[in-house]
Amino acid sequence: MLKQSCRVPFNPQSDQEYSNLKGDNMMRAMKQLGMTAAIIGAMSAAPVLAQEIPADASNFYKSESVTVRQVTFPNQYNMNIAGNLFLPKNLDQKTKHAAIIVGHPMGAVKEQSANLYAVKMAEQGFVTLSVDLAFWGGSEGQPRNAVSPDLYAETFSAAADFLGTNPLVDRERIGVIGICGSGSFAISAAKIDPRLKAIATISMYDMGAANRNGLRHGMTLEQRKQILREAAEQRYAEFTGGETRYTSGTVHELTETSTPIEREFYAFYRTPRGEFTPEGSSPQLTTHPTFTSNVKFMNFYPFSDIET
C-alpha cells in the first residue's frame, strides 16, 4: 500500500521541494496575513546544498528569540488537542497580530517539521501554533493513529477557536501552513471555515487521491476493492478482540531492495534527524495508521466544491 508519511521540509535530498515551498503559493498566502516584502524575500533565498544547511533549519531547532508554551484546547467534539504556542519575545503586547496554524505531515506529529515551521514564522513576528492532529501525538482520540479526515480538518478549526479568542491575535488574520497530508486537511477545513483566511501548503499530498489511485495512478480498481474487503474483514476481527492492524508508514529497516522514497523517509523518521516517539506510543507504531480506518481516505475529496 501507499506510504502515508510525506517528504519533510529542509530535506537534503529534496532541494526542489524546498524551493517549491517559497513559491507563489506561500507568498500569496502569507501576504494576506500581512507579511512584509522583506520577510518574503528572506524566505526566498536560493536552495542550499545538503552540507550548507544551517543549524536553524534543523528539525529540532530552538530559537533564542521565541518563547514556546505547551497548550491544550478542545475541539468541537470535546477531544483535547495538543499544541505548541510560539510567541516572539519582542511581541507588542498592546496590539493584535496575525497568527498561523501549522499542521504536521500525515503519520507524523508536531515535533516533526511543524514545530520548525512554527518557530521560523514566529521569528518573523507571527503568533504561531503547531498542532497534533486528533488521534496523534499529544492529542486525544482512540484508537491511537486512527484516520478521520473530518476530525483532522476539525483540528484546524479548533485551533482557530483557540487563537481567535487569544487577546494577542487578530482573528481576521489567521492562516494555516499545512505540511504534506495536512495540506489537504487544511484545505478541507478552509472550505467550510471562513476564519481560515490563507492557506499555504508544503509538499502537499491529497490523501484521498493518493489512497484511491496510488503512486502515479498505479492502483487498479480491483486492488482498491481488495483493500476495502480486507479492511472490512479486519473490523470483524478487531471487534471480537483481535489485535489492531497497522499499515503503510515508514519502514523500520533498509534493505538492498528499498526504494528511493523508502530511503528518504527512513533518513528522517527513523534517524536522530527527525525521529520522535510521542509519550505512550512506541517506535514500532510511529507513522503507521490503523488499517481499518485508513480506508476512510478513499472517501476524502478535499478539492471538491473548493469554490466555497
Where are these regions (language model features)?
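N-terminal cap/lid segment of alpha/beta-hydrolase-fold proteins
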Residues: 53-95
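The serine-hydrolase catalytic nucleophile loop
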Residues: 107-119, 133
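Conserved alpha/beta-hydrolase
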Residues: 121-138
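Alpha/beta-hydrolase active-site loop
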Residues: 146-167
